[in-house]
Design a protein with these regions (language model features):
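Beta-strand elements within well-structured catalytic alpha/beta cores of enzymes
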Residues: 2-7, 114-125
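Phosphate-handling substructures
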Residues: 18-24, 57-105
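Glycine-rich phosphate-binding loop signature in dinucleotide/nucleotide-binding domains
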Residues: 38-39, 107-115
Length: 147
């Protein structure tokens, strides 16, 4: 099944303006998001602020919206943590792979093969779920992967 993966628009962390947990979009990121379009049956969205705001500021239309931590970013940098999380505990590659397997299991339980699906997520998650078959996505970049 071909699935669309969208990396969030430019965040404050991406622009090197700050190092804070669960950071917001920049003005440029809001502009990038406003250029995004598409029509999807179902959208899976990471619960991180930058992915939610990317979807909020976009012109993407959808039927069902599912928020899940299963497609959030690999916890490495300060921005990859929610406010209540300990940023000294990083996620390993093996832990990310296990989370991807859990996401795929959950994903397949929610969709049917004929549906047009979008996953709004993050650089490392998208790169890993695509098995590194494409370059890591840039901010607000859409990639299509076979799931």
């Amino acid at each position: 099944m071909k699935v669309h993966f969208l990396r969030h628009a430019e965040s404050i962390f991406n622009a090197n303006l700050t190092s804070e947990k669960d950071c917001d979009l920049t003005e440029k990121g809001i502009q990038q998001a406003s250029q995004l379009e598409g029509v999807y049956d179902i959208v899976f969205c990471s619960t991180m602020k930058r992915t939610c705001k990317t979807l909020d500021h976009s012109n993407i239309k959808y039927g069902t919206l599912v928020f899940t931590d299963l497609c959030r970013e690999k916890r490495v940098d300060i921005c990859d943590y929610l406010p209540h999380e300990d940023e000294t505990i990083q996620e390993t590659d093996e832990e990310l792979e296990r989370r991807i397997k859990s996401f795929l299991y959950f994903f397949k339980s929610q969709v049917s093969p004929h549906q047009n699906v979008l996953v709004v997520s993050h650089r490392d998650f998208i790169h890993a779920i695509g098995k590194h078959s494409q370059s890591p996505p840039n901010n607000a970049e859409l990639q299509i992967h076979d799931i």
